[in-house]
Amino acid sequence: PQAESAASHLLAEAVEAEFRQGRVTARKVRRLGAIVLADTPVRPTPEAGRAAVSAALRRDGLALLDWSTAARDLRGRLALLHRELGGPWPDVSDGALLQRLDDWLGPELQALAEGAAVARIDLAGPLRNLLPWPEAARFDELAPEWLEVPSGSRVRVAYPVPGEETTRPVVAVKLQECFGLAESPRLAGGRVPVLFHLLSPARRPLAVTDDLTSFWSGPYAQVRAEMRGRYPRHPWPEDPWAAPATARTNRRN
């Protein structure tokens, strides 16, 4: 205490908050210069908590947040439209979202600052709020969440998010469900053909193409020769143009 009194000008007390492992924590630290005299866990103030979250996100990136499948898909759809059509579709790259943190994620930042776990934060809602109006009315048409294939199945479209190497939307579907499909659907107002991952009955990739006409007219014959003996219960017709598309096996048909 006497030493503290003599060096009172070196005494400092502050609440230090940090965002680690998906939560904001804080401690009250009393220091004498570089020496820690006391370190006590405390509840962070909203201001300190919010500053800690913002600092961590800007330092370590948006991967600190909990990206659900719905949020990732929504971000990928927005990224496609911004890349292909430009404004008013929003830039959802890491840099753009970090620059506008308070604009699009304000209430969620506040919830984290007040102690909410990152796993409880739904990012799909804030991202959807970035949709421009009135253009948002065409969002599902320009970048659909699902596509219907000739078998009648609705298949989810996988959109890459900013930072991934590929920029192509992908549909992964069993080959038999696409018999007769001549052209790959095109997204973003006809600018981007969907890349089809045509799968075996065991859902292993047999072909990757956005030119289905060329596939049925050429490589399909080799795929058929290799697969019909391995999967005899599934249709492998000589003429894939005339065969009915199906998700079923021969026995069930």
Language-model features, listed with the residues they occupy:
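Short, surface-exposed, low-complexity cationic segments
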Residues: 161-194, 198
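Acidic, serine/threonine- and proline-rich low-complexity intrinsically disordered segments
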Residues: 1-146, 189-253
